[in-house]
Every structure is written in C-alpha cells, then in structure tokens.
C-alpha cells in the first residue's frame, strides 16, 4: 500500500527567478507528495552540495536538469518499491547511492526533494497533516517567528553589512497574534522609512533594504517602529540579528565595507556585546565567521549566558559540526535548514542532538524560496519553538506564516505558542 511506485521531477523557479528542483512521489495506494527545494544566497562552505548544470547558455549556468535527471533515473531505480513509511531507510538508500560525504554526485537538491516528497506522500496515506505525521501527538508547539524586516548584506543592495534585522513577538498570545504584531510593525517601519526619505524597496526575504550607514541606524528605525506600533521593546517584542559574518571575514579580521571599518576578532566580540547592551537583542546568528571557532568561543563566553547564539554557517545542520560545538561549548543554538544537509532524516537528527544537549533549534527558510511550506510543519513537528521565514511581504515567505496559522487552527485547544519560553536566556527574566 505504501510502496513507492513512481517519482517525477521538474525544474521550477524560486523566488529569485533561479531554477530549483520540484519532486512528485506517488505511492501504490494513490497517495501523493510534492516538495520544492529552497536555495541560499550566503551559503556556508560546509553545506551539502546543490547540484547545478554549469551550462552558461542556460539560466546563466544555474539550471538543475542534472539533479532532475538523477531523481528520475538513479534515485527512482534505487528506492522504487521501498516503503514510504520507512523514512530512514529511504534516506539512507539515497545517501549510500550518492556515495559522497556532501551529496556532491547526485546533489542535495535532488535527494532532499525526494526525501520531503516521500514524507508528504506517507502522511497522506496515514491521513495526517505533515506536522502530525512527523512529530506525533507531541508536535503542538507553535514557534515564535523571527521576522526579518530590514535586509542587508548578501540579501540586499545597500551599505548595511549585517544581513538581517529581525523582530520576535515573544509577548504574543498565539501564533496568529504574533503574525499580526509583526505585520503592524512592518507597516509602521515602512511609513517611518518613507517619512525619513528612504526607499522602501524590499530584499530577497521581504524586508526593507534602505541605504542606512550602520547596524545602529537600522536598529534605531526598528526600535522606533516597535514603539510607534504600540508595543514594548524587550517585553512584547525582542530583536534578533543575523550578522552573516562569514561574508565579511577576510584575513583574520571582520571588514565592514559599508561602514568603512575593520574589526579584529576581539573587537568583533566586544562590538556585538555592546549592541546587546544598547538594544533588546536576544538572539545573534553567525556573529562570527564559520571557521572562526576561537571567535565563536570568545563570543559564547562573553554573552552566551544572556543571548541566544545561533550557528548557521558554523553548524550547517550537520551533526558532526554540531557535536564539536557542543563539546567545546561553542554557541548555544543551531539554525536548521533542510537543504544544508539534504534529507529529512538528517535534519531531524540535528534537531534532536541540539535539544538533547540543551541547545535551542531554529527552523529556517533560505533566501531563495518557493510556495512550499514544509518548514512550517517541521517547526511544529519538532517543537523547536522558533522559525525564521522572512518578512511580512512576498508570497514565498507568507506561505509559511499562513501554513502556521492553519496548523494552529487545526490543533485548536492543543496548540501552544512558545512565546518567551522559546529563548532560554529570556525565559527566566
């Protein structure tokens, strides 16, 4: 009944107009699953490999026909007839078939598309929503959104070096209430930027991308907008940053090209510490570069007791790198991106390892997204309590928020909004 009978794949476009892989899986009983794979702009060097065609005469070399072909030939031959309900076996079969440590032969985009589509088909067979199929009856925590309302770095064409400035509505009463709060802050910020003579164009993830001179200038606008929208910073809403520091770490120092400054490792740590003292910043992602383990440790020792320090490029949803972080006390949270590792099984393993070690986990989108809302279900399934899925603009971002609203409605009285408990450094305050 749940045997995989057919797999189809195609090349579709993501939110940046670049090709990505979409996969359909059909089971013996007629159940069907479809998944589309996201793509990042600022990618960690240790991520699983996204297979691109390299044909400059087609999509500027970014086509994914090789990955599509891999799905419909080798992967179908390998897992056709397997039980879709045995997710681990299906994923392990594809990983073994690939035969490389980073999925470079078949492509993480090929393997992940199949992995997620198989899970969706199995959920349909079981008559369950995906979050319930993956998470069981315990999957009922609605995550606090990290809403990216100002974009910089690789996600925008402006002088701001940090990549994301986010608001987290920890004081909301529910997920739908959190979405309302975020939307009101977003529109208030738009008015404030326009009044000050700044453009209100948006970046890849739907946040505004004004020409501001520094992180402090961006944070000041965000704080002003929170207050003007009628919320209390630090209580109703806290701030989060994604520095994406790997993008501006060169020759052992952090080069802020937009600001025209260079900071040593020690100066970078102190700069971030001062920002957290001046603003209600409760979460910093990639404050140090992906291989600056020394800097990461210094930052953790300096502010880790009061700020969530999220490893994205540092951990790349990889249990081996996460294990090193846990062993050395580096960071205290992991950003979870399904396409960084390339299968559902490995994604869930990373979340489980983090939670067992007392680290938090943040389910995340990529800057190149589609209408696929799988990560919304996975955030609830894993009870991770936090999700990062962009701003309150662009339908590729709103697809995830809208799915969370539907999940909350479906859970009814069982639904539990994570709120202040999502960030351990905040829960005790």
Curated annotation (Swiss-Prot):
NCBIfam families: eno (TIGR01060). Belongs to the enolase family. GO terms for cellular component: cell surface; extracellular region; phosphopyruvate hydratase complex. It comes from Methylorubrum populi (strain ATCC BAA-705 / NCIMB 13946 / BJ001). One of its GO terms (biological process) is glycolytic process. One of its GO terms (molecular function) is phosphopyruvate hydratase activity. This is Enolase. Its cofactor is Mg(2+).
